[in-house]
Amino acid sequence: MAQVNMRDLLKAGAHFGHQTRYWNPKMSKFIFGARNKIHIINLEQTVPAMNEALNFIQSLAENKNKILFVGTKRAASKIIKEEAQRSGQPYVNHRWLGGMLTNYKTIRQSIRRYRDLEAQSQDGTFDKLTKKEALERTREMDKLERSIGGIKDMGGLPDALFVIDVDHERIAIKEANKLGIPVIGVVDTNSDPDGVDYVIPGNDDAIRAIQIYVKAVADTCLEASQSAGAGADEFVEVSEDAAGAAPAAE
């Protein structure tokens, strides 16, 4: 399992919270103190919280469950997409569409439409259309790519959400809560931890800090799914050996 350490988090500025006047009192137990009217997050709590979350993610990924990466603000968007793709997990990095979880039936129709347009763009259908029609379909496809491209292979509701900036992604968290889907979230000093099952106290604006969180989750997903695959191969080999040995035993 991937690990995070305090030194890397310090270097990345993960301990810097928001201005003290913007704090959320529900985060008080994670705050070490204040410096120049900026709250300082206690990284001695961040590290074990992160590792606990990674343990949970590992248990999901070992069973080939899906973790939906969510981070739509500018600082998180690129990292979320890159790391989710690297680890073979679904993601939302542009804008959360209301009902993405709670109205998944409708979202599935949009995914079908997106796949259809994708196929048309590759099989020469677009070339047979007028320039105007082709442009309209290309624009529709691009719009769908931004909104649901990251979940087109999810194949159903995710088994957990991993969220950067829980206040910014509150709609996603509420939908997950409604459906009983566990939420892992990076929570800053100005944010509300309610509705987050695995709270990771940390700066949710610094790009280097975001990279650490997201990379650790992606690495854990990759390692877990690879070890699960290796375990399956070993099981098959043992079964074959046993089958081959059976006649000799008679």
Swiss-Prot record:
NCBIfam families: rpsB_bact
A GO molecular function held by the record: structural constituent of ribosome
Keywords of this entry: Ribonucleoprotein, Ribosomal protein
Family: Belongs to the universal ribosomal protein uS2 family.
Gene symbol of the encoding locus: rpsB
Domain of life: Bacteria
The species this protein was found in: Marinobacter nauticus (strain ATCC 700491 / DSM 11845 / VT8) (Marinobacter aquaeolei)
Matches recorded under SUPFAM superfamilies: Ribosomal protein S2
Classification via InterPro entries: Ribosomal_uS2, Ribosomal_uS2_bac/mit/plastid, Ribosomal_uS2_CS, Ribosomal_uS2_flav_dom_sf
UniProt keyword Ribonucleoprotein, yes or no: yes
UniProt xrefs under CDD domains: RPS2
Protein name: Small ribosomal subunit protein uS2
Gene Ontology terms: biological process: translation
